[in-house]
Amino acid sequence: MKLTREEKRIKRHRRIRKKISGTASRPRLCMYRSLNAFYASLVDDITGNAILTVSSLGKEYVDATGKRGGKSIEAVQKVAEILVQKAKEKGIDKAVFDRSGYLYHGKVKAFAEKCRELGLIN
């Protein structure tokens, strides 16, 4: 039976997760892209806790942009700015990027490049 796009993404994500893991000092920066919003989290895989989570539906994003739920590249870049700012406040200056099985193109690429520009990932 042929795999759906989502099943292929999950398969890629599992393959990536075998090689990538985050610690408390350098957490894993994972993301999720839905049709209506964009979510990003910093995760410590040793304890299994999410250190920090930001989305385009969150209060910080709504306060900064004046609208709820953004799915454009500009919205994704704003989510990256908020995430990096909150990470710096918590004392996190480096993270490992996990593209969650999504192709490195469009919103995923814009998010990663903005985080790189702001110094969170290499």
From Swiss-Prot:
Keyword check for rRNA-binding: yes
Name of the protein in its database record: Large ribosomal subunit protein uL18
Organism classification: Bacteria, Pseudomonadati, Aquificota, Aquificia, Aquificales
Gene Ontology MF: a single term: structural constituent of ribosome
General function of this protein: This is one of the proteins that bind and probably mediate the attachment of the 5S RNA into the large ribosomal subunit, where it forms part of the central protuberance.
A cellular component term, taken from the record's GO annotations: cytosolic large ribosomal subunit
Listed GO biological process terms: translation
InterPro entries documented for this protein: Ribosomal_uL18_bac-type (IPR004389), Ribosomal_uL18_bac/euk (IPR005484)
CDD domains: Ribosomal_L18_L5e
Alphabetized UniProt keyword annotations: Ribonucleoprotein, Ribosomal protein, RNA-binding, rRNA-binding
Family: Belongs to the universal ribosomal protein uL18 family.
Oligomer and partners: Part of the 50S ribosomal subunit; part of the 5S rRNA/L5/L18/L25 subcomplex. Contacts the 5S and 23S rRNAs.
Domain of life: Bacteria
